Amino acid sequence: MNASALPHMHPSRSFQGLILTLHSYWAAQGCVILQPYDMEVGAGTFHPATTLRSLGPRPWNAAYVQPSRRPKDGRYGENPNRLQHYYQYQVILKPNPPNLQELYLGSLAAIGLDPLLHDIRFVEDDWESPTLGAWGLGWECWCDGMEVSQFTYFQQVCGIECAPVSGELTYGLERLAMYVQGVDNVYDLNFNGLEGSDKVTYGEVFLQAEQEYSRHNFEYANTEMLFRHFEDAERECRALLEAGAPRPSDNAALHRMVFPAYDQCIKASHVFNLLDARGVISVTERQSYILRVRDLAKACGEAFLNTEAGGATLATAA
């Protein structure tokens, strides 16, 4: 559906119209439009369409919305622009196109931020994800003095060098929508673009959940259970990687259990974030948990390179 054909779906009027416009723009650039990954992740980068697909030589262009959870960022629904659950729009372009910045500026123009009418600036801000063992050269994009998105040239993911380098674009959808709609409180965002009794706001959709999950994240999440869940996820990740690894009798077969194993890595990461929000992990323990998750991510990344999607074949695996 073309959002521009429906006035109430224009990005300046509706949150969902903003998403549809970005979908339309990046589909026109040749991206596969994917759905959100169905697990609790801290950022769109955790989606295997980015983390795993950025590895290996095969070209890959995709875009998707990803609900993201950062338990420590909850403010019981009382902060106008800080949330423990929010939405990112993620674009991964591999290999990195030479006109990435031009494509990005085109996406801003598509949602109504004409670079000729707004002060668009790129501020150097290299990106790093310790739990994913990932980093890249990056820039924040500021529009009229407010950060609206970031783009990064991946150098490493899962502790593995990216060859070729991928270009990643990340839009904070709530912040971008607040700017486009001209509102100061995220809960006042018009979600569906309608008015009067038909209007649905962001707060009507998400405020109660934000309040309840803040209580859960800071006060009620069962820490004994979470510690067990972390151990279980870590153990299962390694067990699945072992189960899917080629055997000598397989005649150099490819790895067969990467995605289920990576799901367990994602689970371990989210459980760690909940434990961190509950304040039950010391400073020294925190670093240890980060390293444990990173080790899982690295093992998954290495296994992915021994799959067809990762660029391997039976001939290269031999």
From Swiss-Prot:
It catalyses: tRNA(Gly) + glycine + ATP = glycyl-tRNA(Gly) + AMP + diphosphate. Transmembrane segments: none annotated. SUPFAM superfamilies: Class II aaRS and biotin synthetases. Tetramer of two alpha and two beta subunits. Keywords: Aminoacyl-tRNA synthetase, ATP-binding, Cytoplasm, Ligase, Nucleotide-binding, Protein biosynthesis. PANTHER family: GLYCINE--TRNA LIGASE, CHLOROPLASTIC_MITOCHONDRIAL 2 (PTHR30075:SF2), GLYCYL-TRNA SYNTHETASE (PTHR30075). GO terms for biological process: glycyl-tRNA aminoacylation. It comes from the Bacteria. Its EC number is 6.1.1.14. InterPro entries: aa-tRNA-synth_II/BPL/LPL, Gly-tRNA-synth_heterodimer, Gly-tRNA_ligase_asu. GO terms for cellular component: cytosol. The keyword Oxidoreductase does not apply. This is Glycine--tRNA ligase alpha subunit. It is found in: Cytoplasm. The lineage of its organism: Bacteria, Pseudomonadati, Pseudomonadota, Alphaproteobacteria, Hyphomicrobiales. Belongs to the class-II aminoacyl-tRNA synthetase family. GO terms for molecular function: ATP binding; glycine-tRNA ligase activity.
